[in-house]
Amino acid sequence: MLSNEKDYLLNPPLSLLGPEPWDLDVNTFHKGLQRRKSEPIKEALLDQTLISGLGNIYDDEVLFATKINPKMEANLISLKQAEAIKKESIRILREAIKNGGSTIRSYHPKEGVSGMMQNELLAYGKGNTPCSRCGFPLRKISIGGRGTVYCPICQHIEGKPLIVGVTGPIASGKSSVSTYLESNGYQKIDADAIVSSLYMESDVKNGLSSLFGEEAIKDGNVDRDYLSKVLLDGANKEKLDSFIHPLVYKRIEEEINNSKAKRIVIDVPLLIDSPLEEICDLIIYVEANEKTQIARLVERGKDPKTSLAINSGFPRGKAKKKAGIVIDANYDINHLKKELESYDFLLDK
C-alpha cells in the first residue's frame, strides 16, 4: 500500500500509535492506565498505543525524574503522577532532541553522527552505580523483557518494604551481614532457617525419601549427613534443588507479603537467577577466600572438603556483577561492621 505525507499516519501500524507526549490528553492517558490492572507502569509505558515516542531508555529516565517506581501497578498511578509523566516526557525528549539522541552501543542516529544524550542519562544503563540524588545503588531488573533501572529509595513504593538480598558462597559471612542489618532495624528472613523448618514437615520428609531413598530419614528426622554424601553427585543436587527451592522461595515471599517492616533483609545462598532476585531492591554479595571458608567450616564442625564440593557451583562472577555492594568478609567481625557502616544508606536512621 502506497501512502503520501498526508495519509501515511492513517494506515496500520502507524494508525495504532498513541499520541506523543506533546499531544497527550492527561485525563485520557490516566483512564488508559486505570484499565491496566496488575501491569507495571514501566510495561504500560512501553506500549506505543498508550503513549508513543519514549521507548525503553526514556521510560527509565521519565520514571526516575517523576520518582515513580517502574514496578508500581499502572492502575494505581494518580492523576497528578500522570501529569508528571507527561511533563517530564516532554522535557526529557526536548533535551534528547537538543543533544542529538542517545548513542547506546552500536546505535547512531544517522551515519557519522553520535548523539550526546547518553551523557545526560541519570538511570538507564547505570545499574549498581550511586543514585545522583541519594547515593543508593541504582537497581537493574527486567520488566516486560526489558532492562529497567531505578532507585529503590527515591522511587520507593509507599507501603512497600525495602528488600535487601544477601548472598554468597558457603561460609563466606552472609549470616554476619544479615545479622548486622537485623540489629539495625531490618526484619531478617533466613533461607537456611526456612529449610530447617521445612525438613520438619511430613510432606517434605516423604518427598526426600522418595527422591533419595528411606536412608534420607533417620529416627524420624532428615539425615543431613546422608544428604551431604548423596549431594556430591551433581544430579542428586539438582533433584534436591528442584524440590526444595520452590518451597523456600514461596515461604520467603509469604513472609515478605505478611510483613509490616519497612526494611527486610533476606539471607539466600542461591539468590542469583532465582525468582527472589527480581524482588530485591539491593543485592549484597559477600565473598571470602577458600582459606577463610575452610576455617569457618571446621569451626562449625563441618567437613570442608565435602561442603566446598557441594557448593562448588556457586556463580561467584555473576553474583559479584549483579551486586550493588560487594563485601570482603575475610577479616574479623569488627572489620565487617566498619565496612557495612561505611554505607550510610543501609542504615534506617
Walk through the language-model features, giving the residues of each.
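ATP-dependent NMP and nucleoside kinases share a basic, alpha-helical "lid"
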Residues: R251-N257, R263-E299
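Small-molecule kinase domains that catalyze NTP-dependent phosphoryl transfer to phosphate-bearing small molecules
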Residues: I252, K260, E277-I279, E299-L347
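ATP-binding Walker
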Residues: S172
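Short cysteine-rich clusters marking metal-coordination/redox-active sites
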Residues: C131-C134, C151-C154
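Hydrophobic anchor at the beta1->P-loop junction of P-loop NTPases
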Residues: V164-V166
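Phosphate/anion-contacting hairpin/loop surfaces
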Residues: M1-A65, E73
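Walker A/P-loop
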Residues: S175
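ATP-dependent small-molecule kinase phosphotransfer cores
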Residues: A193, S197-K262
